[in-house]
C-alpha cells in the first residue's frame, strides 16, 4: 500500500498517479472518510486534553485534602469519559476504513515509466538473438505437440475444463527438465536460495502482496471459513516469508526462488489465447523474489532482469525486453520489465517473464522492515518470473521444430532431459 502520509499531505500526487495509470479507482470515498476522521480526531484530542486537565485537578484536590471537590469532578467526568470512549472507538473504525480504502490504490510509479494507455506504449530497450528463418511451413506448438504425441488437451478438458492440459512422455520430461534447469541456474550461478512453499495460503498473505482485496475474482479459493487461496504465483508465499519481521541489515539482500504450479481464473481474459498453452488456469513457473534495502532496489531490479534473460540466452531463444507503460503495468509495481520470447507461429514476441520492482508497496502491507543506523525502515521487494515454464516449453517446440515434425532439444537442456530430440512415435 502507498504511504498514508502521502495521501494526507499530497493527495494531488496520488490523483496524478491514478490518471497516469488510466485507473478507474475513485478517491471520493477515501477523501470523505479522511475528512470525517480529521474532524473526529480534533474532537478526541480536545476531549483528551480536557480529561487530562480534570485528572490533574482531581490530583491537586486530593493532595490538598479537598476530597469533596475531587469526588465532584470525578462524578462530572463519568459521562464525559463514556462519550470519549465512544468517540475513540469510532475514530479507530474510521482509521481502519481509511486503511481498507488505501489497500485498493495502486503503487506509485517510477518517473521513467513510459506514459501510455496500454501495451502499445511499452518501450523496447533490448533485443537479443535473430528469429530463425524456416524453409518449410511453420506449425504452432499445439500441432507440433499433437504430432509428437506429447500433449493431450482433449482428455485434460474432459477431466477438468478448458484452459487445462495434459503433457506426457517426452513432453512431460521436457517440462520437468526446464524446471530443474532454471532452478539450478538461479541457485548455482545467481545466488538464490531455493524454497518449496505452500501453494494454499490465507487471505492475509494474499493481501500482503496485493492480490487482495482488489483482485479476488482472479483467484481460486477453498470453501473453508476462512478461505485458503491457490497461489497465482510463488511471489506470494516467497515475499511473505519475512512478513511482520525486522530483518537484520547484514542478511540483506535476500534472494529467494521456487518452482510451483500456479493457478489463475483468467476472469478478465475470456476469448483470449484459447488455443494451446499460452493462457492456462494451471501452469508451472519458476519465480524469483528479492528483499533488499531501499537504496538498492533499482540496482537489484536490473540484476534480476539479467538473471531471467540468462535462461533464454542459454536456450538460444530470441527475445526482447520492454519497459511497461503506465497503462499496462501491474497494480503493485513501481516499474516493470517484460521479457517477450519470439513465437514463429504468431510471428511476434509474447510475454514470458515480468520483472517488477514493487518499491515499499508490499513491505508496508506486510510491515516487513530492517534496522539501519538505529532506526527501523521498510525494505523494498522485487519479483520476476525466472521464467514461465510452459511458455518456454512452447517456445522450444516452435523455435526448434524440424521439417519432419521432430523437435531438437537445446544443447544447454540436454543434461536435464537425457535426450537430444523428440521424434514422432512409430
Curated annotation (Swiss-Prot):
UniProt feature coiled coil, ranges: none
Key word Ligase present: yes
Main localization, broad class: cytoplasm
Binding site for L-serine: 233-235, 287, 385
This protein's GO CC annotations: cytoplasm
Keywords: Aminoacyl-tRNA synthetase, ATP-binding, Cytoplasm, Ligase, Nucleotide-binding, Protein biosynthesis
Binding site for ATP: 264-266, 351-354
GO BP terms, alphabetized: selenocysteine biosynthetic process; seryl-tRNA aminoacylation
Intracellular or extracellular location(s): Cytoplasm
GO molecular function, one term: ATP binding
Catalytic activity: tRNA(Ser) + L-serine + ATP = L-seryl-tRNA(Ser) + AMP + diphosphate + H(+); tRNA(Sec) + L-serine + ATP = L-seryl-tRNA(Sec) + AMP + diphosphate + H(+)
The protein's annotated pathway: Aminoacyl-tRNA biosynthesis; selenocysteinyl-tRNA(Sec) biosynthesis; L-seryl-tRNA(Sec) from L-serine and tRNA(Sec): step 1/1
EC number: 6.1.1.11
PANTHER family: SERINE--TRNA LIGASE, SERYL-TRNA SYNTHETASE
Family: Belongs to the class-II aminoacyl-tRNA synthetase family. Type-1 seryl-tRNA synthetase subfamily.
Domain notes: Consists of two distinct domains, a catalytic core and a N-terminal extension that is involved in tRNA binding.
Job of this protein: Catalyzes the attachment of serine to tRNA(Ser). Is also able to aminoacylate tRNA(Sec) with serine, to form the misacylated tRNA L-seryl-tRNA(Sec), which will be further converted into selenocysteinyl-tRNA(Sec).
Oligomeric and partner information: Homodimer. The tRNA molecule binds across the dimer.
Full protein name: Serine--tRNA ligase
Organism the protein comes from: Brachyspira hyodysenteriae (strain ATCC 49526 / WA1)
Lineage: Bacteria, Pseudomonadati, Spirochaetota, Spirochaetia, Brachyspirales
Amino acid at each position: 500500500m502507498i504511504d498514508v502520509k502521502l495521501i494526507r499531505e499530497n493527495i494531488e500526487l496520488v490523483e496524478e498517479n491514478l490518471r497516469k495509470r488510466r485507473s478507474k479507482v475513485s478517491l471520493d470515498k477515501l477523501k470523505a472518510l479522511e475528512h470525517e476522521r480529521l474532524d473526529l480526531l480534533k474532537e478526541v484530542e480536545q476531549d483528551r486534553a480536557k480529561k487530562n486537565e480534570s485528572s490533574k485537578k482531581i490530583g491537586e484536590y486530593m493532595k490538598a485534602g479537598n476530597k469533596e471537590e475531587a469526588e465532584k469532578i470525578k462524578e462530572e467526568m463519568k459521562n464525559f469519559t463514556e462519550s470519549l470512549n465512544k468517540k475513540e472507538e469510532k475514530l479507530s473504525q474510521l482509521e481502519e476504513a481509511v486503511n481498507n480504502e488505501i489497500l485498493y490504490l495502486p503503487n506509485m510509479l517510477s518517473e521513467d515509466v513510459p506514459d501510455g494507455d496500454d501495451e502499445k506504449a511499452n518501450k523496447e530497450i533490448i533485443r537479443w538473438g535473430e528469429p530463425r528463418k524456416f524453409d518449410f511451413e511453420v506449425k504452432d506448438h499445439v500441432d507440433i505437440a499433437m504430432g509428437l504425441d506429447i500433449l493431450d488437451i482433449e482428455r485434460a478438458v474432459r477431466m477438468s475444463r478448458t484452459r487445462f492440459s495434459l503433457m506426457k512422455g517426452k513432453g512431460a520430461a521436457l517440462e520437468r527438465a526446464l524446471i530443474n534447469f532454471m532452478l539450478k541456474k538461479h541457485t548455482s550461478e545467481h545466488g538464490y536460495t531455493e524454497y518449496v512453499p505452500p501453494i494454499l495460503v490465507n487471505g492475509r498473505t494474499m493481501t500482503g502482496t496485493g492480490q487482495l482485496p482488489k483482485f479476488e475474482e482472479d483467484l481460486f479459493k477453498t470453501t473453508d471459513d476462512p478461505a485458503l487461496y491457490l497461489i497465482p504465483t510463488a511471489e506470494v508465499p516467497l515475499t511473505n516469508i519475512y512478513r511482520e519481521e525486522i530483518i537484520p541489515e547484514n542478511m540483506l539482500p535476500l534472494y529467494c526462488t521456487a518452482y510451483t504450479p500456479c493457478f489463475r481464473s483468467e476472469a478478465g481474459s475470456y476469448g483470449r489465447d484459447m488455443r494451446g498453452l499460452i493462457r492456462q488456469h494451471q501452469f508451472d513457473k519458476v519465480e524469483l523474489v528479492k528483499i533488499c534495502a531501499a537504496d538498492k532496489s533499482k540496482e537489484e531490479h536490473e540484476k534480476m532482469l539479467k538473471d531471467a534473460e540468462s535462461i533464454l540466452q542459454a536456450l538460444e531463444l530470441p527475445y526482447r525486453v520492454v519497459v511497461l507503460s503506465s497503462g499496462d503495468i501491474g497494480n503493485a509495481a513501481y516499474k516493470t520489465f517484460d521479457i517477450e520470447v519470439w513465437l514463429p507461429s504468431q510471428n511476434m514476441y509474447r510475454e514470458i517473464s515480468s520483472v517488477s520492482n514493487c518499491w515499499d508497496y508490499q513491505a508496508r502491507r506486510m510491515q516487513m522492515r530492517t534496522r539501519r543506523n538505529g532506526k527501523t525502515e521498510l525494505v523494498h521487494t522485487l519479483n520476476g518470473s525466472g521464467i514461465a515454464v510452459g511458455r518456454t516449453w512452447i517456445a522450444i517446440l516452435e523455435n526448434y521444430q524440424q521439417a519432419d515434425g521432430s523437435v531438437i532439444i537445446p544443447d544447454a537442456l540436454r543434461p536435464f532431459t537425457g535426450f537430444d530430440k523428440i521424434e514422432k512415435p512409430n
